[in-house]
Amino acid sequence: MDEKKLFLTALKKKFEVEDPDEKYTNFYCFGGWEQSARKKEFTEYAKKAAEKRGGIPFYNPDIGVPLGQRKLMAYRVSGTDAYVEGDDLHFVNNAAIQQMVDDIKRTVIVGMDTAHAVLEKRLGVEVTPETINEYMEAINHALPGGAVVQEHMVEVHPGLVEDCYAKIFTGDDNLADELDKRILIDINKEFPEEQAEQLKSYIGNRTYQVNRVPTIVVRTCDGGTVSRWSAMQIGMSFISAYKLCAGEAAIADFSYAAKHADVIEMGTIMPARRARGPNEPGGVAFGTFADIVQASRVSDDPAKISLEVIAGAAALYDQVWLGSYMSGGVGFTQYATAAYTDDILDDFVYYGMEYVDDKYGICGTKPTMDVVRDISTEVTLYSLEQYEEYPTLLEDHFGGSQRAAVAAAAAGCSTAFATGNSNAGINGWYLSQILHKEAHSRLGFYGYDLQDQCGASNSLSIRSDEGLIHELRGPNYPNYAMNVGHQPEYAGIAQAPHAARGDAFCTNPLIKVAFADKDLSFDFTSPRKSIAAGALREFMPEGERDLIIPAGK
């Protein structure tokens, strides 16, 4: 047994009495569902709830397939020391995953330069660092639900919306020096020097505000509400800070800029058959999510950076988007957790990165099909060999599509590390799927590999939608729409080449800066750590309603 393998520690703890390489096992001797402390807790609560609601049947683990035929495994959240029950990784049971999704949905970036130009050129009002600071005070009063323009307006209790605020950033160091440090996202402080210079060169002298609408708003409404909530308060705050007349024609220009012209949302609107507005998970492009995750500003390890992106994306795309918005139910959690538990994908990715570093060097070769074929084949075969050598690893990833996703993710990321090219990376993924199917005759459920069979022809063509570069693809990209066990890994492959090159951002420098924000309760520098805290019930979410409900309820 090779003790260097990253997943062995987790396997030994998960299965306890069975060695990871043991070829024979037992069934129905582990205590059934009662071996799980969480399922016992569920059962106790369900009995009380059933009585309270007049005997209407409720949760009963004895219904359906017998639970606990084998070990009900704990899961080690990769990159941490936390062992958690699988149930606690379901997004409904995990406050951190909920908050991550909420933080994305409730964020909107709005350019300030159009509004400043209207003030100066149409209204003859001077804009200075002092007036900008005054405006930022006004928006931080109005955005959570405070009134600024007229009397007899109802307001929101601040205790319900403590998480709501607006911040500002700019690529102009001179302006940044004069802005209120309480509301400034300081690029020079939050990013390594080289990354900061790269970001400032892209942003230039432009100025942007980042508005975090209250969590409770996106819980009650949806992501499409966010730009509207933001725009209304922006208009009111400009009127207040610059002493404008609410009815004059120039106010329409503020409204247009705040609602449309200068708005950067986290996700695009979905088509009618998916019926979701902007800022919903299905519209978040893979490169956008890679920029939302902040691992690249605190680590220079391409593997770790990519793995953190995959973990967060697993929760967003597989658990919440496909698993609930598009499907509903509980089963998609297991697809997602395969990519961020027990250090299995970590082992495969680090193996691939070491192979690449030894043979080519990081970003050391051109993106050719020969390179794709070599790296993808090597990493895929290594991954499949581990499943054959360690039966408990195979049991951990009990579904064929789990194994296919993890092996292909490692192949794709490794190819991207070598080439610094996401298109080469995604073709490494596609080849891995084909090799895997050749070896095992099938992958996962029927149609799992539909998109992988046609992937190379799409990604190597120039077409209006199928030929889209990988970073700009997302859950709504043709053929990517429904098959679980793909989208999180695609986000990691979008990140991998940029992590290898040391880029400051993947797709959008504004989004990268917007989430370099220490006041967010979800830690986007380390999604796995936050998800683990949520599973351990150690994560405190925003948007709670204790202030307005009866005590003790």
Curated annotation (Swiss-Prot):
<comment type="pathway">
    <text>One-carbon metabolism; methyl-coenzyme M reduction; methane from methyl-coenzyme M: step 1/1.</text>
</comment>
<keyword id="KW-0479">Metal-binding</keyword>
<dbReference type="GO" id="GO:0015948">
    <property type="term" value="P:methanogenesis"/>
</dbReference>
<dbReference type="InterPro" id="IPR015811">
    <property type="entry name" value="Me_CoM_Rdtase_asu_N_sub1"/>
</dbReference>
<feature type="binding site">
    <location>
        <position position="446"/>
    </location>
    <ligand>
        <name>coenzyme M</name>
    </ligand>
</feature>
<dbReference type="InterPro" id="IPR016212">
    <property type="entry name" value="Me_CoM_Rdtase_asu"/>
</dbReference>
<feature type="binding site" description="in chain B">
    <location>
        <position position="273"/>
    </location>
    <ligand>
        <name>coenzyme B</name>
    </ligand>
</feature>
<feature type="binding site" description="in chain A">
    <location>
        <position position="228"/>
    </location>
    <ligand>
        <name>coenzyme B</name>
    </ligand>
</feature>
<feature type="binding site" description="axial binding residue">
    <location>
        <position position="150"/>
    </location>
    <ligand>
        <name>coenzyme F430</name>
    </ligand>
</feature>
<dbReference type="GO" id="GO:0050524">
    <property type="term" value="F:coenzyme-B sulfoethylthiotransferase activity"/>
</dbReference>
<feature type="modified residue" description="S-methylcysteine">
    <location>
        <position position="454"/>
    </location>
</feature>
<feature type="modified residue" description="1-thioglycine">
    <location>
        <position position="447"/>
    </location>
</feature>
<feature type="modified residue" description="Pros-methylhistidine">
    <location>
        <position position="260"/>
    </location>
</feature>
<feature type="modified residue" description="2-methylglutamine">
    <location>
        <position position="402"/>
    </location>
</feature>
<dbReference type="Pfam" id="PF02249">
    <property type="entry name" value="MCR_alpha"/>
</dbReference>
<keyword id="KW-0808">Transferase</keyword>
<dbReference type="GO" id="GO:0046872">
    <property type="term" value="F:metal ion binding"/>
</dbReference>
<dbReference type="InterPro" id="IPR009024">
    <property type="entry name" value="Me_CoM_Rdtase_Fd-like_fold"/>
</dbReference>
<dbReference type="InterPro" id="IPR009047">
    <property type="entry name" value="Me_CoM_Rdtase_asu_C"/>
</dbReference>
<dbReference type="InterPro" id="IPR015823">
    <property type="entry name" value="Me_CoM_Rdtase_asu_N_sub2"/>
</dbReference>
<feature type="binding site">
    <location>
        <position position="335"/>
    </location>
    <ligand>
        <name>coenzyme M</name>
    </ligand>
</feature>
<protein>
    <recommendedName>
        <fullName>Methyl-coenzyme M reductase II subunit alpha</fullName>
        <ecNumber>2.8.4.1</ecNumber>
    </recommendedName>
</protein>
<dbReference type="Pfam" id="PF02745">
    <property type="entry name" value="MCR_alpha_N"/>
</dbReference>
<dbReference type="InterPro" id="IPR008924">
    <property type="entry name" value="Me_CoM_Rdtase_asu/bsu_C"/>
</dbReference>
<feature type="modified residue" description="5-methylarginine">
    <location>
        <position position="274"/>
    </location>
</feature>
<comment type="similarity">
    <text>Belongs to the methyl-coenzyme M reductase alpha subunit family.</text>
</comment>
<keyword id="KW-0488">Methylation</keyword>
<feature type="modified residue" description="(Z)-2,3-didehydroaspartate">
    <location>
        <position position="452"/>
    </location>
</feature>
<keyword id="KW-0533">Nickel</keyword>
<feature type="binding site" description="in chain A">
    <location>
        <begin position="259"/>
        <end position="260"/>
    </location>
    <ligand>
        <name>coenzyme B</name>
    </ligand>
</feature>
<keyword id="KW-0484">Methanogenesis</keyword>
<comment type="subunit">
    <text>MCR is a hexamer of two alpha, two beta, and two gamma chains, forming a dimer of heterotrimers.</text>
</comment>
<dbReference type="InterPro" id="IPR003183">
    <property type="entry name" value="Me_CoM_Rdtase_asu_N"/>
</dbReference>
<comment type="function">
    <text>Component of the methyl-coenzyme M reductase (MCR) I that catalyzes the reductive cleavage of methyl-coenzyme M (CoM-S-CH3 or 2-(methylthio)ethanesulfonate) using coenzyme B (CoB or 7-mercaptoheptanoylthreonine phosphate) as reductant which results in the production of methane and the mixed heterodisulfide of CoB and CoM (CoM-S-S-CoB). This is the final step in methanogenesis.</text>
</comment>
